[in-house]
Every structure is written in structure tokens, then in C-alpha cells.
Amino acid sequence: MTEILGLPITRPVKVGIVVADFNDLVTTRLLAGAQQALRQAGIPEENILVVQVPGAMELPRVTRRLSETGVIDGVIALGAVVQGETDHYTYVCQQSAAGLAQASLTGPIPVMFGVLMTANMDQALNRAGGKGGNKGRECAQALLQVLSVEQQLSELR
């Protein structure tokens, strides 16, 4: 039986992080968590490309464009959508999630979904380094695991 596990990545990788500026109190913490996890995994600073976009709606397009450049091995998309008093929250959540899923499924490299969608700012902050952990950090760790699995899958040929 062959078993493929998310082992530590054995080749140099370059990672893109696309981060939304909107709700930057949260997204800067998500970004810091992702960068810290990548550095702890041995990814040098020069192999991390950070791209800032206005908000969650811009994440899918820029993530897809970045994934097509051929200069990175994987992308982490980070954002925070906090529910307000209108339906705008619902549409932003649906469209950013669908767009990032499409970029991941049809694009050339893996895309990690790190967009918080919360009922209030406290929930968002709890998931950006508070008692709920740091979802940016978790996305970085997940990306490295997926890259490892994909490397092992390519070696099956």
C-alpha cells in the first residue's frame, strides 16, 4: 500500500499571499500569521510575495492572475468580511468564496482560502491571532502540506 502524507516540503518554494486591505485590523494579523508560519517552515523572505487588494471581492481575480504568472508555487488568499446591516455581506461572501474556489480548482497552482466571514469584529479578531488561533497561519501550513502532497503525486509517474 502506498500512502501519501503531507510531509515537509523538500524543494524550494515561492508563495504568494493576496491580502485584502478592507478590515485591515484583522487582515494584517492574518498576514503576519501566514508569514510567520512560512518563515518557520524555512521559506526565505525573498520567496514570499505579498500583493494587497482593496477588499474580498478583488481577491479571486488577483489570485487567479498571480497564479498564472508562473513565478510562485501556491497562493494564500486572506480577507475578512464582517456582517453588517445589509445584504452586501452575503453577496461578498458568496462571490469571493466561489471565485477563490474556481481559481483553486481550475488554476495551475493551489489556492488556500483564508477569508474570514464572521458575524462581528470580535469573532474575526479571535480567528486572527486570538483564542480561535490564526487562520492565516493555518492557511500557510495547509498550503505547504498540499504542495508536499502534489510533489509526491507528481513522483508517482
UniProtKB/Swiss-Prot annotation:
Active site per UniProt: 88
Keyword Transferase part of the UniProt annotation: yes
Cellular component terms per the entry's GO annotation: cytosol; riboflavin synthase complex
Alphabetized InterPro entries for the sequence: LS, LS/RS, LS/RS_sf
Signal peptide residues on this chain, from the entry's feature table: none
Binding, (2S)-2-hydroxy-3-oxobutyl phosphate: 85-86, 127
Reactions catalysed, as given in the entry: (2S)-2-hydroxy-3-oxobutyl phosphate + 5-amino-6-(D-ribitylamino)uracil = 6,7-dimethyl-8-(1-D-ribityl)lumazine + phosphate + 2 H2O + H(+)
Pathway: Cofactor biosynthesis; riboflavin biosynthesis; riboflavin from 2-hydroxy-3-oxobutyl phosphate and 5-amino-6-(D-ribitylamino)uracil: step 1/2
NCBIfam families for the chain: lumazine-synth (TIGR00114)
HAMAP family, A to Z: Lumazine_synth (MF_00178)
Name this polypeptide is given: 6,7-dimethyl-8-ribityllumazine synthase
Gene name linked to the record: ribH
